[in-house]
Each structure stands twice: as C-alpha cells, then as structure tokens.
Amino acid sequence: MKSITWSDGQHGATDFIIEADNLDRPITGAIWLPSSKSKTPSFVLCGHGASGDRYQEPIPYLAKQLGKLKDTAILSIDGPVHGLRIVAPGGREAFFKEMQSPDFIDHMVRDWRIAYETIITEYEFKPDKLGYFGLSMGTMFGIPLLASHLNFDTAVIGLCGSSGAASLIGERLLEDAAKIAHPIFFVMQLEDELFDREGYLALFDAIKTKDKRLHANPGLHPEVPAEEIDFSINFLRQYLTQKDVSRRTVNPISE
C-alpha cells in the first residue's frame, strides 16, 4: 500500500512524503507545479549535493527561472540521508557512510522513479519532455538515473568524476555514462578538492552522446561561477522547448 502526504513547502513549492509497505524509508521531496493548466508539461528532475537537501541552491533559482515557461514542472527529492530523512550527523559525513552500502545507488534510482511516477499519476500529467539537473552527489545518482528506462531528453551534470570522492562507484558511473545518448552539459571545477581532473575527463569521455559539452572553470568544488548556472538553465530551456535542436558548426573557423 502506498500513500502520499502533502504540505506547504518553501520557495513556492509543495512538499510531499511518499510511504509504502515495500519501501525501507519514506521518499521526501518538493514539486513546483507549472503555472499553466497543461496536462502535458515538461518536467525537470533536480538532484542536490551531499551537503544539502531538496532546497539547496541553485534548485530554487532554477525552479523560478524555468517556471517562467509556464508549462514546466520542477521535481526535487531529498538524498538518501538528507532533508526530511536526515541521518545524523548529516551532510557529507552521513552520505559517505551511506556509500558503503552496495545498493545505495539502486535504492536512490528507485526513489526517483517512484517519486516521478507518483507525481505524474497524482496530477494526471503526461509529460512532453523530461530533463535532469544535478551536480556533485546529484551526478552520482543522476548518471544511473539517466541510464535507466526513463526517457530523458537532456541533462545538466558535473562536479563529479570517476575517481576521488566517487572512487567506490567509479566503474558503475563509467558503465552507466556509456548508456546516455541525449544532450549533456557538464560542469567542471579545475581545482576541485574532491575530484581530480583525470576522473572528471574520464567520466565526460564515457558519456555516449556526441551532443555533449564541458565548461571548466578555475576554483574549488563549490566555486561554480553564477554564469554557468544561467547557462545550465538556458541549455535545459533550449532542449525542453524546441522539437529539434541541432548544433551548428562553423567549419573551418580559421585558415
């Protein structure tokens, strides 16, 4: 038996808690509904970092900007030991302990699928397009989710590699990245203290699609320039609102 409980959220969102007899933990999240009454909105699923929860920036900012499209819904859920299902001491320390479980990725992908399918069923939505945004821990879970049977159209990922803080799951990430065939924007920090450059590039190179791009900036893990977030939003908007998006190449650009 499955149930969903609703409550007022933050930043204009509605919080929800999904419980079921076959779940070992509740699924907690937030939904920003489209301002239009369309039953075929685009959806963007948003994953947060290990130190945050479903409302970690830039998720509320992204929801506000993409919400201007009127027929776009934003769905964010808490990580496995985060937010409304926090496990002490919380944050990265709790997450790194969670990573010791051999099934932690599959359980989180399951949570994402249940949350998405429950929400679209509750509101009788038939999404037209499906996108994903998730950096750092949001990429650790995002890449396996993007490789699942959900039909994603585009995604923004990054702040993650196949080594460093993700070394325990590096091979899994590389294998799943090789299944991703839709457009990808990848964010990289050149002095990232959690992920080395080699692991970053190995993960980016493993992504199957040819329609991918990487933006690299100097700075530590959390020092992503604001303009990269704006680029991420525009990237998602482009692929969510246009039926056919092709990359134009100027060739040759110089002689």
Where would I find each of the regions flagged by the language model?
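Short beta-strand element of the alpha/beta-hydrolase
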Residues: 39-49
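Short amphipathic alpha-helix adjacent to the substrate-entry channel of hydrolases
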Residues: 56-77
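Short alpha-helix in the alpha/beta-hydrolase fold that links the catalytic acid
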Residues: 59-60, 145, 169-173, 182, ...
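N-terminal cap/lid segment of alpha/beta-hydrolase-fold proteins
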Residues: 1-39
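Alpha/beta-hydrolase active-site loop
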Residues: 90, 94-123
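Short beta-strand/loop motif that positions the catalytic acidic residue
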Residues: 180, 186-188
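Primarily recognizes the serine-hydrolase "nucleophile elbow" in alpha/beta-hydrolase
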Residues: 110-179
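C-terminal catalytic histidine-bearing segment of alpha/beta-hydrolase fold enzymes
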Residues: 202, 209-255
